[in-house]
């Protein structure tokens, strides 16, 4: 069993590519869908993610995992891997960054997390409760890896939903551009400064919600 596989790969990428950060590019690809969860009184309580990993990462992650039926992996079979991966993602803030009325918000540790395996791909499901549930007229959420070791792309169908939100709330998703020109400029700057700590920000998926 690979303990904290995703976290270990992230650390290896960040540390191993430290001298080559000007050439940052993704090594893991995730197709994401998310839900912003509201309480009956209109309070935002958290974010529910479903992250489907690329086939190559999924295959590698499952190497050495024995099951009763070859090629079939139940939630129970995948539970240890789900737990260790969720724990390892803590230091990366779960790649989820929220602001309400412009003020940064913090998340508690994930709940209701599990892995499932369908059609050759692993999907990690997790819910991030807000440390302080709140009502906000303006809520901004970004999902990305600052080091750009992981590329997040939101699904074409139902990429983001509001669950239990007041009917008048308006949701927008701004997908990242390819960032080619910006990346080249930033690469040149990073080559001089050696800083690539927030390279992935230009590839962030930006979600905004406005409620009256």
Task: Enumerate the language-model features and the residues they cover.
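Structured domain cores in non-transmembrane regions
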Residues: 56-134
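Positively charged n-region of N-terminal signal peptides that target proteins for export
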Residues: 1-4
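Short solvent-exposed loop/turn micro-motifs enriched in small/polar/acidic residues
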Residues: 29-30, 90, 108, 202
């Amino acid at each position: 069993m690979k303990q904290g596989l995703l976290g270990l790969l992230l650390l290896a990428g960040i540390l191993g590519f430290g001298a080559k950060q000007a050439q940052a590019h993704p090594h893991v690809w995730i197709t994401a869908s998310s839900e912003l969860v509201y309480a009956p009184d209109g309070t935002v309580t958290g974010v529910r993610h479903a992250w489907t990993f690329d086939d190559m990462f999924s295959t590698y992650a499952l190497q050495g995992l024995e099951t009763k039926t070859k090629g079939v992996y139940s939630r129970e079979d995948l539970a240890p891997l789900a737990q260790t991966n969720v724990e390892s993602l803590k230091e990366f803030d779960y790649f989820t960054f929220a602001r309400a009325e412009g003020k940064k918000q913090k998340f508690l540790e994930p709940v209701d997390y599990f892995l499932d395996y369908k059609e050759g791909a692993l999907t990690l499901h997790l819910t991030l409760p807000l440390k302080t549930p709140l009502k906000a007229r303006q809520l901004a959420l970004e999902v990305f890896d600052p080091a750009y070791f992981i590329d997040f792309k939101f699904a074409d169908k139902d990429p983001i939903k509001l669950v239990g939100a007041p009917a008048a709330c308006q949701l927008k998703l701004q997908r990242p551009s390819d960032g080619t020109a910006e990346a080249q400029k930033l690469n040149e700057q990073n080559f001089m400064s050696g800083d690539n700590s927030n390279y992935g920000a230009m590839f962030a998926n930006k979600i905004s919600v406005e409620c009256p």
